[in-house]
């Protein structure tokens, strides 16, 4: 039975066929699609399916947070709405998810947000799909954060103030953190929630998505300094050590060796030895967990990811220093 106190906000930008699958999964439920300047036929496709559409204007810049807030504002004009399902346009809801999740929220009024198992559409098509699927494998139980697909209690949304429009990355963990600060619980349950279609096939796509993570870590630390409810400061410190301090030490040692004392080259050698040893440690650990075929490449991506995150972190700092609004870090194919 479709409940009248539940509605769905779908957001997207140039999602193509992924959006059609996403909107099809919401049929029967009250929903709205919020488009962030798509250059494809997303808006027309949504309207053909009978879904109300909000087209964001480009003047304020596009962000997932702004899109979600626009959908929330429209749907909450109806005071009977108690729960809102957030859904990214690259994901399709699993049948029965909303019934399972709303029943849980009905029974536990202190729960502000609930999500279930997100699975990748083609996890074996490439290492990227496999890494997506692994990332989505959140254990059931209390959770600190949620992603773009989550069922939210309207009272909790209002209490925490919604998403931050000006965040181009990290808007979901930021909102999750503010929900917890306001006293709400977040939980993951062992139930299928949605199918995600990352459609990632190129290294450049992975690199830009990982850059976005570095940008998010930097901004989350700045927005929530000293909070005991997160460890983003530790994540930022790891980025700065592996992709900042060590490379600088290697270059400095090399310059000293070239200009002053050849023995200083030992510093560069030690840095590379440390990198190799850390890569070997991670490769062994992940190979034991996932097998050599997946574990070894995954270890390499984890190491390389620190450099992509460093680029994103520096991008955030540069924009902040210049008091300039950031622009989307896009990675998807149209």
Protein language model features and the residues they cover:
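Short, well-formed alpha-helical segments that are part of the catalytic scaffolds
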Residues: 10-28
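Short beta-strand-to-loop acidic/aromatic patch adjacent to the donor-nucleotide binding site
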Residues: 79-92
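Conserved donor NDP-sugar-binding/catalytic core segment of glycosyltransferases
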Residues: 92-126, 197
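Glycine-rich, basic loop-to-helix element that forms the pyrophosphate-binding segment
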Residues: 58-77
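Catalytic donor/gating beta->alpha subdomain of glycosyltransferases that bind UDP-sugars
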Residues: 166-167, 173-231
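A recurrent flexible, glycine/aromatic-enriched loop bordering the glycosyltransferase active site
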Residues: 120-121, 135-152, 159, 167-168, ...
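Membrane-embedded multi-pass helical conduit in multi-pass membrane proteins
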Residues: 243-318
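A conserved acidic beta->alpha catalytic loop
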Residues: 35-44, 58, 91
């Amino acid at each position: 039975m479709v409940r009248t106190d539940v509605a769905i906000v779908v957001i997207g930008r140039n999602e193509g066929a992924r959006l059609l699958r996403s909107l099809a999964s919401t049929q029967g439920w009250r929903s709205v699609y919020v488009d962030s300047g798509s250059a494809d036929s997303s808006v027309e496709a949504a309207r053909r399916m009978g879904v109300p559409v909000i087209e964001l204007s480009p003047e304020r810049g596009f962000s997932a947070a702004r899109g979600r807030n626009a959908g929330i504002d429209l749907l909450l004009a109806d005071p009977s709405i108690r729960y809102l399902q957030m859904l990214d346009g690259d994901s399709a809801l699993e049948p029965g998810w909303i019934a399972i999740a709303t029943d849980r929220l009905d029974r536990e009024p202190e729960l502000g947000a609930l999500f279930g198992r997100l699975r990748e559409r083609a996890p074996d098509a490439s290492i990227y799909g496999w890494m997506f699927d692994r990332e989505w494998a959140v254990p059931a139980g209390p959770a600190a954060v949620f992603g773009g697909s989550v069922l939210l209690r309207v009272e909790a949304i209002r209490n925490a103030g919604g998403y931050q429009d000006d965040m181009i990355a990290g808007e979901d963990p930021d909102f999750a953190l503010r929900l917890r600060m306001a006293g709400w619980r977040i939980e993951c349950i062992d139930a299928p929630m949605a199918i995600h279609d990352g459609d990632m096939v190129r290294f450049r796509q992975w690199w830009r998505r990982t850059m976005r993570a570095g940008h998010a870590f930097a901004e989350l630390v700045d927005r929530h300094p000293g909070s005991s409810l997160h460890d983003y400061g530790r994540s930022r410190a790891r980025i700065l050590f592996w992709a900042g301090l060590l490379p600088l030490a290697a270059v400095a040692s090399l310059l000293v060796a070239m200009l002053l004392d050849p023995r200083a080259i030992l510093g560069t050698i030690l840095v590379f030895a440390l990198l190799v040893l850390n890569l070997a440690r991670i490769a062994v650990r992940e190979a034991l967990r996932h097998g050599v075929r997946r574990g070894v490449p995954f270890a390499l991506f984890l190491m390389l990811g620190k450099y992509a995150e460093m680029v994103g972190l520096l991008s955030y700092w540069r924009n902040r220093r210049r008091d300039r609004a950031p622009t989307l870090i896009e990675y998807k194919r149209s």
